[in-house]
Amino acid sequence: MKELIDRLYSARDLSDGELLTLIGGEYDEKYLFGSADKVRRKYYGTGVYLRGLIEISNYCKNDCLYCGIRRSNDKAVRYRLSENDILSCCDNGYELGFRTFVLQGGEDAYYTDDIMCRMIKKIKDKYPDCAVTLSLGERSLESYKKMFSAGADRYLLRHET
């Protein structure tokens, strides 16, 4: 098994059969995790990156059964942060040392492209040294492009089943 781990580490490629052997077989966990840790350190180092998550809304048009903010959950106390509330969270986060803000929420039609782009621009204008990540569910390609043009740095699109 160490031979497969070593080959995966050095060549970064195994056949499907070899991967299945590795996943399903008996192996030295300490050796495997040590190799994985070397790869992690090589590409990501040992730094810790803090991100300020701002849950902007728990309204969602979807009804995913596993999700607490699903449309049909009548026990959820719904909220939607105003633009001023969101910008205030960024102010507080900046004071605390955060340099990435993640605006996250359900698929809430209230937050149109115009509203999001205006907020992104305000955040980037006030805090040009900060990154803005969005996680607001599925949107159109045009919507993603508009938000990127407004200054968004990343979009976290979750695909859960």
PLM ranges: what are they?
Residues 71-86, 93-114, 119-161:
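Core AdoMet radical
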Residues 1-62:
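Flexible, acidic/Gly-rich N-terminal and inter-domain linker regions that tether
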